[in-house]
Amino acid sequence: MSRSWIVAAFVFITVGAFAQDYQFITCGPGYNKQSYVNIKEGTEKLVNNDAWDLAFTAFSFQDAGIFINESSGSTQGQNLPLTELYDARVTNFTDNIILDSITNSRFLNSEKSWTYGAFNESRVISDPYDFGWGKYVPSAQRVNGNKIYVLKLRNGQYKKIMIESLIGTTYTFKYANLDGSNEVVKTINKMPVSPTKLIYFSMTTNDIVDVTPSRGYDLIYGRYISLAKDPNGTIEQQYNVTGILTGPGTKAVAAKGVNTMTVSHLDYENSYSAQTDIIGYDWKALVGTSWSIANDRAYFVKTVENRVWKIVIKDFEGSATGNAVFEKTDLGISSL
């Protein structure tokens, strides 16, 4: 990447009624961090990939989403270990778990929204009371856990885990070694709920972890697992990719095959989606030994405050630094 154009890029530019600026983001050498990006403030908070393992939604009194941390760095082209979740294929927490029987029952986060995570992937979609890890009981106004999982941690250790309940605003869950030793029971209270709130938990510290910036964030830049084609472009399978996800409460729409200087957000104002990977990872491609950026693609991002930004990604340096740069244009508050 040419440093000279970056210096020039950070000069504040006014085009018509809108202001353009450039924002530098990074997920570190070897993609070893997650970046929580605030577009308006032009800031980011960096968190180590292994800072947390589970994330519980705390958006309202009705949600019960639970995510795993799929972020993993790389070294010499090889992915480092990450948190993995499997169906234990047993009925009771005390049952014997056979690891060889669970290898084909892995659960991943879906990038469809922040409503459901990996722990919710086994739910029956047509049943609004089914949260995957448990079912809502209307008469008791609680979610009762009914599924046992196995977590493979980054250090190679296995833990069995059960989300026992969500009563009111309190999650209760337990985990232990596969032989039942070192059992830990934890509770997490959602309060105060917020439309953008996730509560992060570390299996290493056995406690809640402070991950997100105090002033909020709009984007997450780092690693996650997604369907992607192999380097030859022939086989599509799950890969650990480097990309940008929108945060809870943030929506986005992609404008592809356009002139990024003249494209209007008004043509896309009815197409915003809460799907988290609208920006995703495929705005870049490895050509030989260097990265090429799609120059006919813009993204319109609507933040929690209903402010609309045009995002055009300008540069990506790969695993050597994890650095990227995007151009941002403040388009003001949306009336929709």
Question: What are these model-predicted stretches?
Answer:
Residues 1-24, 336:
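Bacterial Sec-dependent N-terminal signal peptides
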Residues 20-336:
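Surface-exposed, beta-sheet-biased, low-hydrophobicity segments with strongly acidic/polar composition
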